[in-house]
UniProtKB/Swiss-Prot annotation:
Species per Swiss-Prot/TrEMBL record: Methylocella silvestris (strain DSM 15510 / CIP 108128 / LMG 27833 / NCIMB 13906 / BL2)
Biological role stated in the UniProt entry: Cell wall formation. Adds enolpyruvyl to UDP-N-acetylglucosamine.
Protein name: UDP-N-acetylglucosamine 1-carboxyvinyltransferase
CDD domains per record: UdpNAET (cd01555)
GO BP annotation list: cell division; cell wall organization; peptidoglycan biosynthetic process; regulation of cell shape; UDP-N-acetylgalactosamine biosynthetic process
Domain of life (superkingdom): Bacteria
Catalysed conversion reaction: phosphoenolpyruvate + UDP-N-acetyl-alpha-D-glucosamine = UDP-N-acetyl-3-O-(1-carboxyvinyl)-alpha-D-glucosamine + phosphate
Protein residues bound to UDP-N-acetyl-alpha-D-glucosamine: R102, R131, P132, V133, D134, L135, D316, I338
Localization of this protein: Cytoplasm
Amino acid sequence: MDRIRIVGGQELNGVIQISGAKNAALPLMIASLLTAETLTLDNLPNLADVNMLLRILGHHGVDHSVDGRRLGAAPNASRPVHLTARDIVDTTAPYELVSKMRASFWVIAPLLARMGEAKVSLPGGCAIGTRPVDLLIMALEKLGASVEIEAGYVHAKAPKGLRGAEIKFPKVTVGGTHTALMAASLAHGHTRIVNAAREPEVVDLAECLVKMGARIKGAGQSVIDVEGVARLNGASHRVLPDRIEAGTYAIAAAMAGGDVMLEGAEAGLLQSALDVLVEAGATVNVVNEGIRVQRNGAGLMPVDIVTAPFPGFPTDLQAQFMALMTKAKGQSRITETIFENRFMHVQELARLGAHIRLDGDVALVDGVERLEGAPVMATDLRASVSLVIAALAAEGETMVNRVYHLDRGFEHLETKLGGCGAIIERLSG
């Protein structure tokens, strides 16, 4: 199993190219199931999750190629990928596939909308009553689907097609909004999505669906209107830049000090995070090429944050920002409002010398003068990169274990940081 070795204390200086957004790429790829024609996606990141989803889509009959050549289960997804679901060969998504990636549950919407039936395994680890797919199921039922949950599978049927309706989410849900958009695009009549997620990745999906012939208005606002159409066509679409990757490297630059250009990053996608970095003591400039982040040795200041749906501070940057605050001059308060149990990185940061106290959904971080390298273990995607950020400022060597979590969401992380002066290497075995 791979590990990443980091020797801290080096400034970061250089250019980091921001990849396409994983959180946009996955629903865009799933949208290929809505049409028999080819959907071409450019700027797909070359990530474990992207390549796994290609395998899952292939199970349903999606053919994928790059530069006109059919490839295996793990293509070089950094080039334009052509996805063609000419024939849906299976409307069942089995547990052994869905359990590998939670987002793959979203295939239920296009399969149901196009074929009138879908049977999809509940994602691994879902507890009845608290599972995040409840709102997705509610959206499908509002559109007229009959849904049964049996033996760990969600079986949805709409033999006469889906019918437009008002879908009012009790809380903001990105996955629910993705599901509603894809299903409503092929439903009969008008659908209104109320309390819709406003995330840029939702807007990106809507823009792609419109290119495919969908009639959608209001994406990026809390109310979205969809007028269903009989069929969707193929299209070409470029995945938007990854705001979470950009925010992560911006935080890394603030942590290590130095001068980093985030090429291709769009400030409008992560303004709340950039504002917080400025409060903490970094200098942030938006230029034609992207975003430039600098910190010249001045100490970090403590800043309180509360995670919130877009345009608030993203929960996917919470762990990274906590790592930054471990070196601030004073106490910061971090409140997590989106996900339960998203402080799994705290114990591992403590192994590096961080002082963090937990009280429910609040973490109180008392900044320390020095962090010290140590062996640590990644528990999930965002937690793993928070350990890398802390290690950049720690004295001595840090070994991050279980880095397969990193590979799910960060393209060539050690190469990008190493190119800016970090002492970082991947060790196999």
